[in-house]
């Protein structure tokens, strides 16, 4: 087999081995993608966003239940916001 053909064969097989070793990519979840995008736009960046999901740097009444960080109560397992006026 000529060198060029051998090289092309190796280049074709190498990516298949890499994909097989890593495994298939995880399935795409649109809901997680939307939540992540919304958090990037509106919610306070902190290492663990789970309890702070409702807290925003600005008051956003009616926007996914988000409220300002100053009035957001995250003392329990979930954050609570006072009712919007």
UniProtKB/Swiss-Prot annotation:
One of its GO terms (molecular function) is toxin activity. Belongs to the conotoxin D superfamily. It comes from the Eukaryota. Contains 5 disulfide bonds. Expressed by the venom duct. This is Conotoxin Lt28.7. Residues 22-40 form a propeptide. The cysteine framework is XXVIII (C-C-C-CC-C-C-C-C-C). It is found in: Secreted. Keywords: Disulfide bond, Neurotoxin, Secreted, Signal, Toxin.
């Amino acid at each position: 087999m000529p060198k060029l053909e051998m090289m092309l064969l190796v280049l074709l097989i190498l990516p298949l081995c890499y994909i097989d070793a890593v495994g298939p990519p995880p399935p795409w979840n649109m809901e997680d993608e939307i939540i992540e995008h919304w958090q990037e736009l509106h919610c306070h960046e902190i290492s663990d966003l789970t309890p702070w999901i409702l807290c925003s740097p600005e008051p956003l009444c009616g926007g996914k239940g988000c409220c300002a960080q100053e009035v957001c109560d995250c003392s329990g397992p979930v954050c609570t916001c006072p009712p919007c006026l």
